[in-house]
């Protein structure tokens, strides 16, 4: 089941409209909301070479974009010790949809602070999050 779950992580390329005054970066259209309930949007920041790991959401589906900087996301399947790595941000602007019940962490890989936007189907609830220490899951960041 875990192996199939990692394969359910989806990447959707997003449109950037380049303008001399500053870019317009698409995130989500109303028509894309028909299959899930939007409940909360929030930003997370990550500094260069810093790592935030590991988290496991019991119920929340994540919809992640990186409008500033660049971030390496790492997803882990405990069943077969398999990892999936996806980089988002500068050079690869996309939305990453992550179903619940997947261990994940991320690292800032841009020289300046990166910003992650999460559009989730649930409001923040510390009771639906499992955490473990960075070294509990062995990954060479």
Predicted regions and their residues:
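Glycine-centered loop/turn positions within well-structured domains
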Residues: 104
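Non-catalytic, conserved peripheral segments adjacent to functional cores
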Residues: 1-95, 109-141
């Amino acid at each position: 089941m875990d192996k199939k779950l990692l394969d359910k992580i989806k990447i959707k390329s997003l449109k950037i409209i380049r303008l001399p005054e500053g870019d317009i970066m698409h995130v989500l259209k109303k028509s894309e909301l028909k299959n899930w309930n939007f409940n909360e949007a929030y930003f997370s920041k990550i500094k260069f070479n810093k790592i935030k790991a590991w988290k496991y959401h019991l119920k929340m589906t994540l919809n992640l974009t990186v409008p500033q900087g660049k971030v390496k996301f790492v997803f882990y399947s405990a069943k077969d010790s398999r990892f999936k790595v996806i980089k988002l941000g500068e050079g690869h602007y996309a939305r990453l949809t992550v179903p619940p019940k997947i261990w994940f962490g991320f690292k800032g890989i841009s020289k300046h602070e990166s910003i992650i936007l999460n559009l989730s189907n649930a409001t923040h609830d510390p009771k639906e999050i499992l955490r473990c220490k960075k070294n509990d899951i062995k990954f060479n960041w």
